[in-house]
């Protein structure tokens, strides 16, 4: 693939430890010192095998991977790191209601320095489209049907104060055409990021596309279990699919088109490739239109 197209890479968690946060391992009994030794080795291996700038050269267990890439006046990509600087997942991690810890200002996904860098970059970007290429879903998706609520504490809803801070910034600073990207959860999503997730009728201030895995997780499903209930609970979710595949985008000054390319199976050769869904975002309108 790299012989055919250029790569812009970033990591998530499995390069070093599932659901890691800062210097905290998910595994019980692993000290911060031991985890940082593992992280230093993982960073070195990552740097040696990925196309990265020299500025990303690791220094022991530290590696500066967040950066921006400019494609003229058309698009600016802000590649974030939401693992290395985050605080521990609140509420014991997992799918939980938002406990006070998840709502507190002390929790951070990006860390202060990266957050300020991002906000400065968005404020000064001359681009028509501003993309946030990062690790985990921003939309506050309720995974529990009915009156009870459950959100992923590993995703941005576990860091609700900073999540709201980000969306408020995009709205109040009138960031041009913000489009967020994520991965992590081996499934496809197309979301409208509304200003207030407590008011499901509030205005969308950005759009979000979550890309599936190429092969991890097996064959997957076109319609995940509980899809009808999930869409009813979360009307800002415009598409969800758990097949394997990739996301393809075509960007022009007038539109951003995203195609969800999937296959029905990966457990044997020969699966035909299809476009399962397509969405178009028009310049100046942060809503999703089915193509």
Regions found by a protein language model. Name each.
Residues 1-291:
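Metal-dependent phosphoester/phosphodiester hydrolase catalytic core
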